[in-house]
């Protein structure tokens, strides 16, 4: 789960185990959008509803790390899932969307499976993912939090998380980036 100040009011979080790179994609036929700092301004961008990608575009994103809001006045189109936005983008360049935002791994999976989209530019931000435990759990959640946190720290230290990331994604997403 993405760590946010709002969620931290009701949930305990472990140390981050993974940093999701947020990326943008366009239809494979698009030649106009090449610079994310300027070319997405005013464009129709599909994102999952109430996800960090929507919060990034409406400039309400509040997560740890350094990032800049570089898209001005986007026309945000929300979907139930990232996959639905990607499917609409795949219909054609500008048919329903000009671009879509999702995790780099989700977009890359779509590209690899033959979806007619392409990833544009570098990640816009990295969101930390951590295990979350309800602060109001019936039993004291802190011992569980401590054990899960300890395990995550050990997996970072011994390289297990890096090994899993490299195996499944082809690169290491376990280190804080863009900070």
Predicted regions and their residues:
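Periplasmic-binding protein-like
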Residues: 19-26, 52-58, 104, 108-179
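Flexible hinge/capping segments at coil-to-helix
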Residues: 27-48, 60, 64-67, 139-140
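Ligand-binding cleft/hinge of the Venus flytrap
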Residues: 53-80, 111-112
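Acidic, polar ligand-binding/catalytic clefts
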Residues: 1-39
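A ligand-binding cleft/hinge motif common to bilobed small-molecule-binding domains
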Residues: 1-10, 56-59, 90-126
């Amino acid at each position: 789960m993405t760590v946010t100040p709002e969620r931290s009011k009701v949930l305990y979080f472990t140390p981050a185990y993974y940093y999701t790179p947020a990326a943008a994609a366009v239809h494979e036929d698009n030649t106009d959008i090449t610079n994310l700092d300027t070319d997405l301004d005013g464009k129709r961008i599909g994102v999952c509803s109430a996800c960090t990608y929507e919060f990034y575009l409406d400039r309400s994103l509040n997560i740890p790390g350094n990032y800049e809001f570089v898209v001005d006045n986007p026309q945000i189109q929300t979907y139930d899932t990232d996959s639905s936005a990607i499917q609409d983008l795949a219909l054609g360049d500008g048919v329903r969307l000009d671009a879509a935002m999702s995790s780099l791994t989700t977009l890359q999976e779509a590209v690899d499976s033959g979806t007619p989209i392409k990833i544009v530019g570098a990640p816009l931000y990295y969101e930390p993912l951590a295990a979350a435990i309800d602060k109001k759990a019936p039993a004291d959640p802190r011992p569980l939090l401590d054990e899960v946190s300890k395990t995550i720290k050990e997996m970072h230290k011994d390289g297990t998380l890096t090994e899993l990331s490299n195996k499944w994604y082809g690169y290491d997403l376990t280190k804080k980036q863009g900070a």
